[in-house]
Amino acid sequence: MLKISNLRYEILRDVIISDFSLQLRAGEVKTLFGPSGCGKTSLLRLVCGLEDKKSGQIENGFKKISFLFQENRLLPNLTALKNIEIFSPAGVSEIYALAAKIGLSLSDLNKFPRELSGGMQKRTAFLRTILSGCDLALFDEPFVGLDRDLRGVLIEILVSKIEREGLACLLVTHDRFEAARLSHEIIELEPKGMGLRRVVGLDEPLSARDERYEERVVSEQFGGVSYYE
């Protein structure tokens, strides 16, 4: 379990996160939903140790964390395949099978990041994250720039990992439809300090959700608007 208690984070005395608490268990997905600059990405960086907190506690009982940044952050001197393999206990056959599902050919996997489009790099980074053997995954806007069909395939792969292997996920998104599709709990935040506006709990199993479910939740909870305004 990940347990965050009364967390405070500052940059040059500017309070980014103030008194924030959260618990995340195996197989759960919790989504941080709020405007840009409210501290969502900072929280992910604190969880994985890239930033130092001012006060509070972060207790992580998971064995391995993987972080899918907004930027793809592939190693430039390795092929797409090697970028995945170097962090993954999965066999090459599993990598090939999942890559084919998301439109990456064997030829694509043997290319260096600079030879791939931005979308291909994003898909490679996604595979690297979910095949890393992690039991806690941090996702920062993982589907931005992907078309609707491709987004759906990636979500199906992620949901399978969550439900079959108990992967825990902390997700940052501005997209209400993504939040409705993937979250057990949507944590809606105030514009400053990661203040809690409200929590929306969703009980429907992830694998039972579809676009109609997304639309219903968005309409009921957010008035039908897709992006945080």
Segments from the language model and where they lie:
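The feature captures the beta-strand-to-loop junction immediately N-terminal to the Walker
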Residues: 33-35
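Helix-to-loop junction immediately C-terminal to a conserved catalytic motif
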Residues: 48
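Conserved ABC ATPase "signature" region
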Residues: 92-108, 160
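Conserved ABC ATPase signature
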Residues: 112-116, 120
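Hydrophobic anchor residue at the start of the ABC signature
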Residues: 126
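Catalytic Walker B motif of ABC-type/P-loop ATPase nucleotide-binding domains
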Residues: 137-141
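Conserved beta-strand-loop-alpha-helix hinge in the C-terminal portion
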Residues: 191-221
